[in-house]
A protein has these predicted regions:
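Eukaryotic partner-binding/assembly regions in large regulatory complexes
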Residues: 1-84
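Short acidic, hydrophobic short linear motifs in intrinsically disordered regions
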Residues: 30-38, 109-122, 127-139
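Short amphipathic alpha-helical interaction segments
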Residues: 45-53, 140-157
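A short, conserved structural fragment
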Residues: 58-66, 156-166
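Short basic alpha-helical hairpin corresponding to helix-turn-helix/winged-helix-like nucleic-acid-binding
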Residues: 65-120
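Minor-groove-contacting beta-hairpin "wing" of winged helix-turn-helix DNA-binding domains
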Residues: 70-74, 168-174
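Short, amphipathic alpha-helical interaction segments positioned at domain boundaries
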Residues: 85, 176-197
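Intrinsically disordered, low-complexity, charge-dense segments enriched in Lys/Arg
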Residues: 152, 164-167, 174-179
Length: 197
């Protein structure tokens, strides 16, 4: 039965399944607006074969999720340790998002910025400097350059931002960044809906 299912899948899907799994299983996102042609190709293949990929990943205990211009994987069943790890990771992204929105309220999908401008702004804005110091305190990251490098590395690893010009170190925020924004909005809505005792 499984062999028949594999033989009936489109050839592009058979060719891309492993590459998609390798990226998404590490917690990365695939964005429609990626500057990386491989990422865009994988995104388009999922979009064209969404039901087939969803069925395939469901068979191995994963759920293919989509947002506004991005795809990611989640587990259908998670143990307590995995949930705690996700909460810790999400807590970290709350701080990142707070910092980035303090830097510029327009910081969202499509936004472009230079690394040097971000470093300079940290030096000029006291509130931003305090938030920056808090971001990676436990890792011993100290200078503004180290903080920004670590943040850009984290954003790049998740697929939330990509370097579009190595010459002047310009970065572009991808559609996948909306995932973090949507999670924060859900928490804010949930907090507003809570009835005080």
């Amino acid at each position: 039965m499984q062999l028949i299912k594999i033989l009936n899948t489109p050839s592009s899907m058979r060719n891309n399944t492993q590459r998609i799994y390798e990226r998404l299983s590490r917690g990365e996102f695939l964005s429609v607006d990626s500057t990386n042609s491989t990422v865009r190709h994988l995104y388009e293949d999922i979009e064209e074969n969404m039901d087939d990929y969803a069925d395939y990943f469901k068979e191995i205990g994963l759920r293919l999720e989509s947002g506004n211009g991005y795809f990611y994987l989640s587990r259908t069943v998670e143990n307590k340790q995995a949930i705690e790890s996700k909460l810790e990771s999400f807590s970290k992204w709350l701080d990142y998002l707070d910092f980035l929105k303090c830097y510029n309220q327009s910081f969202t999908a499509g936004y472009q910025f230079r690394k040097s401008n971000l470093i300079e702004q940290i030096s000029l804005d006291i509130e931003l400097k305090e938030k920056a110091r808090h971001l990676f305190k436990k890792y011993g990251v100290g200078s503004n350059l180290e903080i920004v490098n670590k943040l850009l590395q984290e954003m790049g690893n998740m697929g939330f931002a990509e370097c579009i010009s190595e010459q002047d170190e310009t970065y572009k925020v991808t559609s996948a960044f909306c995932y973090a924004e949507e999670l924060v909005n859900m928490i804010q809505i949930a907090n507003e809906d809570e009835v005080p005792e």
